[in-house]
UniProtKB/Swiss-Prot annotation:
Cell compartments where the protein resides: Secreted; Secreted, Extracellular space
Function, in words: Peptide hormone that functions as endogenous ligand for the G-protein-coupled apelin receptor (APLNR/APJ). Functions as a balanced agonist activating both G(i) protein pathway and beta-arrestin pathway of APLNR. Downstream G proteins activation, apelin can inhibit cAMP production and activate key intracellular effectors such as ERKs. On the other hand, APLNR activation induces beta-arrestin recruitment to the membrane leading to desensitization and internalization of the receptor. Apelin also blunts mechanical stretch-induced hypertrophic induction from APLNR.
Organism: Mus musculus
Transmembrane segments: none
Top-rank lineage group of the source organism: Eukaryota
Species classification: Eukaryota, Metazoa, Chordata, Craniata, Vertebrata
Protein name: Apelin
Amino acid sequence: MNLRLCVQALLLLWLSLTAVCGVPLMLPPDGTGLEEGSMRYLVKPRTSRTGPGAWQGGRRKFRRQRPRLSHKGPMPF
C-alpha cells in the first residue's frame, strides 16, 4: 500500500513537472523551436537607405541626371 502511494506521488510529480515545462526534463532541447537565441537568424536588421551599399556607387554612375528647370523657360503645357 505504501509503495503504491509513493509510485502515485512520484507519477503525479513527474506529470505536473512535464506539464509546466512542456517537455520531459531528461530530453535535451533539439533547437527546432523558436528560442531567443535563434530569433536573430530569422530576422534581418534593416539597413539605412542612404548608407553605402554593395552596388550603390555603381548605380549612381548610370543614373540619368534630372534636367535643371531653373534656366529652361516656361513649361510647354
